[in-house]
Amino acid sequence: DYFEVSKNHNIVKTIHMETEWDSNDPIGETEWLHKLFEMTGFPNALVAQAWFDRNDIAKVLENQSKYDLTRSIRHKPKSTNNPNTKLDNIKGSLKDPIFRRGYSLLKKHKLHFDLQTPWWHLNDATQLAKDFPDTIIILNHTGLPSDRSFDGLNQWRINLEEFSEQPNTAIKISGICVPGKKWTAKLNKEIILDVINIFGYERCMFASNFPVDSLCATFDEIYNGFKNITAGLPENEIQCLFHDNAIKYYNPV
């Protein structure tokens, strides 16, 4: 239960991320979440499911946008396993014309795009942001910097900097677990401060990625780590990272 694991922190509103509900029923999760909101007062906004390469994507987006809590859409684009593999001609990727055609419909419904992709595809995400400047892209999981080698982090920074140059981009700091290692502030401090430096505090926000990130730490360990790492920042910047930016981008009720 989210509120049990987060009870030591002042959670005032929640934003639900789609959980890859039955792809044949993308509206089902949205309906259920609205019923949950009516019963509990949570969640207060949601990122809904819609696969841009569906034949009926126009209808799916129209239906998702009718729900009061829907703010953004997530469709995880196809990706490669490493930066040395080409993405060209892969259906469902950021470069796929069918994917991009479906993506183009977000503007009509004033919906954001929550993007989960590894850093080596951020050049394609940058092009997407350029081609559709009226749609905000919120990069999930910090661009997945799991390769903590010198070269890996250097290329992650380069690609992230290029992506951040587009004014219609933002980033969520979450999902920075390293396989086989415990989440610690020492391990992740450099990553977090780099992201804030690259995007500026006005376009960054912390996210829990729970329950997935419970595989590498408790909620307290992660959020106390976030707080300790940013403790030296001005109070207004901390307020933006933990609260105001989430309000700005997701407009929770």
Q: Across the structure, where does each feature detected by a protein language model lie?
A:
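Active-site gating/metal-coordination segments in enzymes
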Residues: 24-120, 127, 172-177
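Active-site metal-binding loops of divalent metal-dependent hydrolases
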Residues: 19, 50, 77, 142, ...
